[in-house]
Amino acid sequence: MRDALSVYRSLVARGAAPALTWYGGDGRIELSGRVAANHLAKICGYLLDEIWLTPGQALHLDLPAHWKQVLWGLGGLLAGATVTCRGDAAPSASGYATEGAGCASGIDARRGSADGDSAGGQAPACVLVTDGPDSRAAQAAQDVLALDLGPLAMAWSGPALPAGVHDAAAEVMGSPDDLADETAHEASNAARWQASASR
């Protein structure tokens, strides 16, 4: 079975050869193995070092099908996240993935406790990556990362971001170019994604 780390290593090994090609409404995008691996390392480092994502914590991608969704999903798996997407399983009150709809179910369940304690322990909240930082899902998440889907966007280009919302495209650029933690991925739900893809 290929886990997120083996995908990352394969991308590094591809070097300048094409690794990801995307055709969308904004044209054609092609990333080399080196560039894709660089994105994954930066996303992983950002989630671990700046957002403080914990092993197995829910990372919900409230994004349409897009090449940036692919990179953030793989970067999240490298960071050890339980990655879910629009219309997929969602974080529960414990912050870990169960059936549901986005971050809302987990956050709403925790609101009954003033300190966020759930099921006898401190619950890690959902981290949300979204192209709609003013959405209902964004209101329910603890950490909201606004992602501009423009092909060359280096920062959020939409309306001013609400207080506390991170500009994911801009902030991730300060993270290391190489993967610093090669063990974090072990806590991810990569096996579930692999099983779904093979059906």
Predicted regions and their residues:
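Residue-level marker for well-ordered alpha-helical positions
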Residues: 5, 41, 67-70
